[in-house]
Amino acid sequence: MSEDKITGTLAFTVFTAVLSSFQFGYDIGVINAPQEVIISHYRHVLGVPLDDRKAAINYDVNGTDTPLTVTPAYTTPAPWDEEETEGSAHIVTMLWSLSVSSFAVGGMVASFFGGWLGDKLGRIKAMLAANSLSLTGALLMGCSKFGPAHALIIAGRSVSGLYCGLISGLVPMYIGEIAPTTLRGALGTLHQLALVTGILISQIAGLSFILGNQDHWHILLGLSAVPALLQCLLLLFCPESPRYLYIKLEEEVRAKKSLKRLRGTEDVTKDINEMKKEKEEASTEQKVSVIQLFTDANYRQPILVALMLHMAQQFSGINGIFYYSTSIFQTAGISQPVYATIGVGAINMIFTAVSVLLVEKAGRRTLFLTGMIGMFFCTIFMSVGLVLLDKFAWMSYVSMTAIFLFVSFFEIGPGPIPWFMVAEFFSQGPRPTALALAAFSNWVCNFVIALCFQYIADFLGPYVFFLFAGVVLVFTLFTFFKVPETKGKSFEEIAAEFRKKSGSAPPRKAAVQMEFLASSESV
């Protein structure tokens, strides 16, 4: 049938949309590889002296034996005494943690507004408007070498985080609305695939002989402006979402025109009838507030389970690995930690592609549990490898293998699954609010990990992943006892299972919109 094929216009439009997802991934990974170079620059800007060991590390990473050049405005002051040096080193650590975590702050703030902006401006104009934030953030970071680097990088990553918070809802929504029903799940996962591809590209570009060195690290940080500019140009040729035009604006003529371009056919009657049914069913359900999600017995257990799934995803330690993998591999004794980090990114991308095939064949709950159990054992082996590294040099390979497997198990289940399951927990009325709250909680947990991981790692040393092993075990047990299977079940069946566990009465209305679930998927 015509609606089942991928037309040139559809492929072009999806590619254009996931350029935002690519930027999202690039911004996640770009701060990792040049960590030592940027910290070294922070120290010089702030006048904090380097001890011999750190100097050797920094200059080796920089690929030069010459200290970083500092502009006259930031000339290093006279040497500090030992107490002042120790205190200032903590300041540098704090500024670096803020440089990493400020990205999540921006995403946390903006995550509630992606849907609102898409409804207000339309999907295309909303993505165009969001790119102004991406370009601003890239400009701030690109200029950071020539000013107070710590302030400009923190500001730039905050603004970039705002952009990513917006598009984390906009892009999956837009792709889900333009995709044929039978292709919606597969095309929806391209958001996640583009994201992890962005992470991988940022890690490759961050190699010291490419851009991750003292001369070019600011270019590396500002490079996300390139896909932003490209997307701004290509969006001018993309059709608006037909569902937005028909359901929100009630412009049937424009909706048909958009559908004809996307489907490559003049007969779009089936799509129009589907949207008409969706509009009628949506109009019978009232929107649900955040407070109602917790006070209404019909929604309380599903939202608590949804939040726990997202907490499990973030508190598993995955972003600690993504943000700080280079330093983790250094601790593990890997001679070329940046290349090991790139290996993590490659495995991340490969298993994201694998999950596209698995998610529709195995149950959501089954995949999530499989991933969590695998991650639990990986954190144990990772920790054992780090603890015994001083006694057995080959333990570095144990830790590295455990990290690779950890990422693989994450992408099999805990990475993509929460977004599918949260959408399946709720009908059309409460779904937007529930998804917004879930996205917000995801960003909050992301921020906590980004801000605190370095301090926790410094405090616990090689034992840090034993902590995450305990956390993963708790969430695994919660999933086993509390999370229902949703594969192949209607909303009424899922809601009935929740009501059975909570002992609440059936809701007055439960509209089924299972065909639109995949459009809600995000990172």
Curated annotation (Swiss-Prot):
PTM remark: N-glycosylated; required for stability and retention at the cell surface of pancreatic beta cells.
GO cellular component, one term: brush border
Tagged with keyword Transport: yes
Domain of life, source organism: Eukaryota
Segments on the Extracellular face: 32-97, 148-157, 208-216, 324-337, 389-401, 454-460
PROSITE patterns xrefs: MFS (PS50850), SUGAR_TRANSPORT_1 (PS00216), SUGAR_TRANSPORT_2 (PS00217)
A Pfam family of this chain: Sugar_tr
Positions in coiled-coil regions: none
Keyword DNA damage part of the UniProt annotation: no
Tissue specificity as recorded in UniProt: In embryo, expressed in endoderm layer of yolk sac and liver primordium.
Major location (coarse): membrane
Residues with attached carbohydrate: N62
Membrane topology of the entry: Multi-pass membrane protein
Chain positions found as Phosphoserine: S522
Protein family: Belongs to the major facilitator superfamily. Sugar transporter (TC 2.A.1.1) family. Glucose transporter subfamily.
The protein, known as: Solute carrier family 2, facilitated glucose transporter member 2
Species annotation: Mus musculus
Gene: Slc2a2
